[in-house]
Curated annotation (Swiss-Prot):
One of its GO terms (cellular component) is membrane. The keyword Hydrolase applies. Belongs to the lipase/esterase LIP3/BchO family. InterPro entries: AB_hydrolase_fold, AB_hydrolase_sf, Hydrolase_4. The active site is at residues 27, 94. Pfam families: Hydrolase_4. This is Putative esterase/lipase 1. One of its GO terms (molecular function) is carboxylic ester hydrolase activity. Its EC number is 3.1.-.-. Keywords: Hydrolase, Serine esterase.
Amino acid sequence: MRLEIENGLEFVCDPFLNERGKIFFLHAFTGNITNKLSFRTHFKDYSFYGINFPGHGNSVIHNQSELDFNFWIKLVQQFFNKYQLKNVVLFGHSIGGGLAIALTQVLTKEQIKGIILEAPLNPGIRATPPSIISALVPDTNEDFEAVQRALIYNIEQRFGANFKDFCAKQKQKMIQKYAPLKVMLQPEQAEQRLQLIDAAFKRLSYPTLWIHGQEDGIVRYLPSKAYLESLHNPLIELVGLSNTAHTTFFEQPQQFLQLVEQFLNKLNK
């Protein structure tokens, strides 16, 4: 999978001859396309597309308006039109999941085949303490440690005695790279995104697989489940993974891939 850059925007356009289908990946806040390299390798007989949004990966921020959710929606819409993409499965993680849902109200029926959501941003996030949200771009080592515990189940057991050293080093890298994104965490911006996502969820008309860690500390599972149940939409299938937090693919890759494989097989029947 080769990343390209055009006008400061990094993207992947990786078509496969005799494809089984097309997948467009929408990354998480401070994430990037390369987070799903092994996913792309597993589904090598699918064409794979994605954008690193401004401030992510090697994509440049020309001005702050490029961090607006609606700007990201327009970028994807332009990409779909440029490459004449049709029958695409949108796959979004966290804010990328919310973006996938919002796109269902902008892209055409011809362009979307189905949706895969990994711990998607949804109105259930209102139950998450504001201190966790604001720390997604951390100010202190303690902020960073709290977010890591919310992201990955039992992360301290994974790292053992190295956990605090890991956090101290990574926090500094995080601040250097992602400080410009802190504006996206402002309550007004966050609420505008949620209202847009909520409206799109209420009109969702595509088969959707929603995979969510039951120990997620960023977008909490039970409030998200309650929100989903309030929609009464039989097209959305929710799968909660135990002993898993916000990074379900990273934490439970085999189970995640199996669920996605089953979903894609259903779509292709």
